Swiss-Prot record:
Exclusively expressed in the hermaphrodite gonad. Expressed prior to oocyte division. Widely distributed throughout gonadal oocytes from the mitotic stage to the developing diakinesis stage. Expressed in sperm. One of its GO terms (molecular function) is zinc ion binding. Disruption phenotype: No visible phenotype. Double knockout with oma-2 results in sterility due to an oocyte maturation defect. The oocyte maturation defect is due to a meiotic defect in oocytes in which the maturation process is initiated, but there is no progression beyond the prophase stage of meiosis and therefore the cell division process is not completed. Animals also have a larger number of oocytes which are larger in size, but the oocytes cannot be fertilized and accumulate within the gonad. A zinc finger (C3H1-type) spans 112-140, 154-182. It comes from Caenorhabditis elegans. It is found in: Cytoplasm; Cytoplasmic granule; Nucleus. Residues 46-80 are annotated as: Required for taf-4 binding. The lineage of its organism: Eukaryota, Metazoa, Ecdysozoa, Nematoda, Chromadorea. Pfam families: zf-CCCH (PF00642). This is CCCH-type zinc finger protein oma-1. Keywords: Cytoplasm, Metal-binding, Nucleus, Phosphoprotein, Repeat, Repressor, Ribonucleoprotein, RNA-binding, Translation regulation, Zinc, Zinc-finger. Zinc-finger RNA-binding protein that binds to 5'-UA[AU]-3' motifs in the 3'-UTR of maternal mRNAs to suppress translation in oocytes and embryos. Acts as a ribonucleoprotein particle component that may exert part of its function within cytoplasmic foci of unfertilized oocytes. Acts redundantly with oma-2 to control the temporal expression and distribution of maternal proteins and thereby promote meiotic progression, oocyte maturation, fertilization and embryonic development. Recruits the translational repressor ifet-1 to the 3'-UTR of mei-1 and zif-1 to negatively regulate their translation.
Amino acid sequence: MNVNGENNEKIDEHHLESSLAGVPTLPVSPLDHAKDLSQTNPNAQIGDLVTQTANLIAIKKQLLEDIAFNQHIQSMQVRAIQSFPQNNQVAPPFQQFDPRRRGLARMQKPESYKTVICQAWLESKTCSFADNCRFAHGEEELRPTFVEPLQNNKYKTKLCDKYTTTGLCPYGKRCLFIHPDHGPNAYIRADKLLEVSQRHALADIRDQMEQHIMTNGRIAAPPLSAIQHPLEMFARPSTPDEPAAKLPLGPTPVSTRGPRYELPTKELHDAEGAMTYPPSRWPLDPSMFALDAWNMAHRPASPLDSMVLGSAPNAGSFGMLGKQNTPGGVSGYSSAGSTPSQDLSSSSLNAASAAAAAAYFANSAVAQSLLMKSVATDPMMSCNGPFSPMPGFDQLAENMTKHLNLW
């Protein structure tokens, strides 16, 4: 320890003298200092070497980590540069997702578009997809296929399941299986051809009717010359030979929803000369429904029929306003007896309806002509009979009220 102290003192004195003399001196490195110490103490030299080695290892490890990090950054920069467009092309701006692009992609027609007959159309000529169907609706829409035929050893070696079970195959002649006895139509079996043809015919009729309604807006009404007279329509029932389309649009006539009255064409008498009635169609007393010529000519109209006749544009004298076609014609009548409201025991609604119907039929020129014809042809229609040709208005209203209650 004394030797080291003396050496340090000598070094300090040397530096002090050099600094005082103005001569620059180099700093002593730790290694030189270690050499000086090694000359004096070998244990101190070993400790210094171990410390320096550990420091060098730590520095090397840090340098390796820095190199790896720099290489990673460089590789990322190279990738970013390579992703840029080449040849001075400008990258398109960022576009947001448009849901219509997916729809456009779906609208792209594949090669198999309209190359096979639609199964639903083949069965009944109706398809829920209509024009948007991917399959052909008829041979006129059938497109040729561009798929090259492949070598298939099983071609036409088995029966077609669709053709044999259901009688229909949308592939027709292009089917890879056997269609036994297909006849003139390769899509439909011979025994199913009539049934399918009927379905197609009904579909064509339905399409024509829909097209007619869509073009005209509504079903065209028949001309006035083809429309029957209101009394003729009410006097006889509709027959199956008469199509419903010829009937005028509006409320259903009485003859189609109630007892079917028919004007007697000739007299009905039994052997004793008494008046007989035709068989009734209701399971009630026939005398309540079979009317004589007078009551038939003056059969009261229901409120619905009265409105129909009163609102018809060509009704003429069939208006419900009385003789002079004024409201006073109904209520302002003269009668030898009491008024209908005093004699009728039914409700006020039936009485009012009976009075209106009586005024309508009594004041109608057509009713008068029918009345005179009935009087001329029917011997029972006399002044002494149950109903006189010109009875009192009260009696006429009472009789009509009885029949009006049947409705």
